[in-house]
Amino acid sequence: MVDISRELQVALNTGKVIIGFEETKKAVLAGTPKLVILAANAPKWARGDIEYYAKLAGVPVFIFPGSSIELGAAAKRPHKIMALAVLDPGQSEILKVVEHV
């Protein structure tokens, strides 16, 4: 099993990750992310938007098993993170989380 918190850190340090709902939504509409991660407590409207557009674009969505506060902590950020998009995983194996879903 992939340790999502550790792999997220590696992706943030060696790859390209977009943080924030609006930025993630724009990236999904452009079809550029390789993976979208949503906090488990994301509002239904936000989750519905991202999941709908991600399905159309063929982008996998992973629901982080924790709140937006915990996702922010996993990303070593001092704020909540509802959504993020992995554009380039770098040296991480974060894309393997979708294999276990």
Swiss-Prot record:
It comes from the Archaea. One of its GO terms (molecular function) is RNA binding. GO terms for cellular component: cytosolic large ribosomal subunit. GO terms for biological process: translation. The keyword Glycoprotein does not apply. Pfam families: Ribosomal_L7Ae (PF01248). Keywords: Ribonucleoprotein, Ribosomal protein. NCBIfam families: PRK01018.1. Belongs to the eukaryotic ribosomal protein eL30 family. PANTHER family: RIBOSOMAL PROTEIN L30. This is Large ribosomal subunit protein eL30.
